[in-house]
UniProtKB/Swiss-Prot annotation:
Residues 1-45 are annotated as: Disordered. Gene3D superfamilies: Spore Coat Polysaccharide Biosynthesis Protein SpsA, Chain A. It is found in: Golgi apparatus membrane. Belongs to the glycosyltransferase 34 family. Its EC number is 2.4.-.-. Residues 73-480 are lumenal. The gene is GT2. GO terms for molecular function: hexosyltransferase activity. This is Probable glycosyltransferase 2.
Length: 480
């Protein structure tokens, strides 16, 4: 699920200066005294076209080699570069800058040449070998970033918290302050029913947050047009981390995921020395290199420098277009079971953690003792059985904490599963969770597939006593 929109691509030229290609269009024939030099004009036009082709071919080759050289075709950590390697890489960057300057200096630029110049500005690097490619890619990354490089966020945040005691990083009971973040597209769904179920999933998240003292943000804006689709969450998370230093944990949750255990609480004390909490399996990640070893539909980031650094390292595969397409080929070649499609945020994170394990994994907690992400297909038809045999508050397969409708896409015009099955299953999941909320007020749904409700507890003259005696983890009746 993604959103984000203010561009941070400093490599993109606008009108005017900045080293981009000149934006003056060729003068039409007959509109100037210079038209008498038609032969010279045609010669320069042919030469300019040839130069544009050179730019396009050069940039395409550089991008392919840079991505392959940097990301690699294996999952081993790259050797640390020596001083000589760094010097060679710097020379490579200098050489390619010189070549592009020479090409740009000859003749004007039409729209195609301007587009090629933009690409060249983002990837002004050569790739004679893997070391030089890495140096060149690092140079390109400087031109595309989520935002200005921040290196002292922990210190800035500590100072802010000291200066603003009215905004502590903890809430009642000393619990860390959490901000749940979700989002959806700014326009209406292709399927009208999609908006209805989007409202239900949002209501479900609001209910859980209200019960557990968690703040919530539902974003509708595209904050970065380069990171659309799967990737839109990254710039949003960064913006929220920096805008809310009082928040200790940022919790991303896809719009198609629902809380289905309203009594379960995150065991945050378990994660004292970790900064990323994500559902997954160690064996699928490190032994099988599976593309579904982790799930980025629901995960938590600590608000700290480490998380900012990870976002910066995670984002470079995300810019839409050629870069994302080429990165997708590399991910498919290296992650088991991954279909051939453009780079997605989940595969990119898995690849990053595999290829740079020593750098990141000591701060990552791969959680599977409860369902921070629970795949819906194996859960929704077992809710009655769960209600018969178990109770809320468990969070695992007995009573899943989160049910995630991966592949359903209720807001889109297509999905991996029949839309009728998806909508029926989402209705069951919502009502299963909603019963846990409604019983606080003495009501319940007549059935898991019915929006209608019934009274399950009579009103009394001593409602406070009833409230105090209510156990949110008690079993829920399955009778209609």
């Amino acid at each position: 699920m993604g959103q984000e929109g203010m561009g941070y691509n400093n490599g993109k030229g606008g009108g005017g200066g900045g080293g981009g290609l000149p934006m003056t269009a060729p003068r039409p024939r007959g509109a100037s005294p210079l038209s008498s030099h038609g032969h010279h004009h045609r010669s320069r036009k042919i030469h300019r076209t040839f130069n544009n082709v050179k730019i396009t071919v050069l940039c395409g080759l550089v991008t392919i080699l840079v991505l392959r050289g940097t990301i690699g075709l294996n999952l081993s950590l790259p050797n640390q570069p020596t001083d000589a390697d760094a010097l060679a890489g710097a020379k490579a960057v200098e050489d390619i800058d010189r070549i592009l300057r020479e090409i740009r200096s000859d003749g004007g630029a039409d729209d195609d040449a301007a587009a090629a110049g933009d690409l060249a500005g983002s990837f002004n690097a050569t790739a004679l070998n893997a070391t030089e490619a890495a140096a060149a890619y690092a140079s390109a990354v400087e031109r595309y970033a989520l935002g200005p490089k921040i290196s002292d966020w922990d210190g800035q945040r500590r100072r802010w918290l000291r200066q603003n005691p009215g905004f502590p990083s903890t809430v009642a009971g000393g619990k860390p302050r959490i901000l749940l973040v979700t989002g959806s597209q700014p326009g209406p769904c292709d399927n009208p029913l999609g908006d209805h179920y989007l409202l239900k999933t949002t209501k479900n998240k609001i209910d859980y947050c209200r019960l557990h003292g968690i703040e919530i943000v539902h974003n509708l804006a595209h904050l970065d047009t380069e990171l659309a689709g799967y990737w839109a969450k990254l710039p949003l998370l960064r913006r929220l981390m920096l805008s809310h230093p009082e928040v200790e944990w940022i919790w991303w949750m896809d719009s198609d995921a629902l809380f289905t255990d309203m009594a379960f609480e995150l065991p945050l004390s378990r994660y004292q020395d970790r900064n990323l909490i994500i559902h997954g399996y160690q064996d699928l990640l490190f032994e099988k290199h599976s593309w579904i070893a982790l799930n980025t539909g629901s995960f938590l980031f600590r608000n700290c420098q480490w998380s900012l650094d990870l976002l910066d390292a995670w984002a470079p595969m995300g810019p839409k277009g050629f870069i994302r397409d080429e990165a997708g080929k590399i991910l498919t070649a290296n992650l088991k079971g991954r279909p051939a499609f453009e780079a997605d945020d989940q595969s990119a994170l898995i690849y990053l953690l595999l290829s740079q394990k020593e750098k990141w994994m000591n701060k990552v907690f791969i959680e599977n003792s409860y369902y921070l992400h629970g795949f819906w297909a194996g859960l929704v038809d077992k809710y009655e059985e769960m209600m018969e045999n178990h109770h809320p508050g468990l969070g695992d397969e007995r009573w899943p904490f989160v049910t995630h409708f991966v592949g359903c896409k209720p807001c889109g015009s297509y999905g991996d599963y029949p839309v009728e099955r998806c909508l029926r299953s989402m209705e069951r999941a919502f009502n299963f969770a909603d019963n846990q909320v409604l019983r606080l007020y003495g009501f319940a749904h007549k059935g898991l597939e019915s929006p209608k409700i019934k009274r399950v507890r009579n009103q009394t003259t001593k409602p406070i006593d009833d409230k105090e005696n209510l156990d949110v983890k008690a079993k829920i009746s399955t009778t209609s």
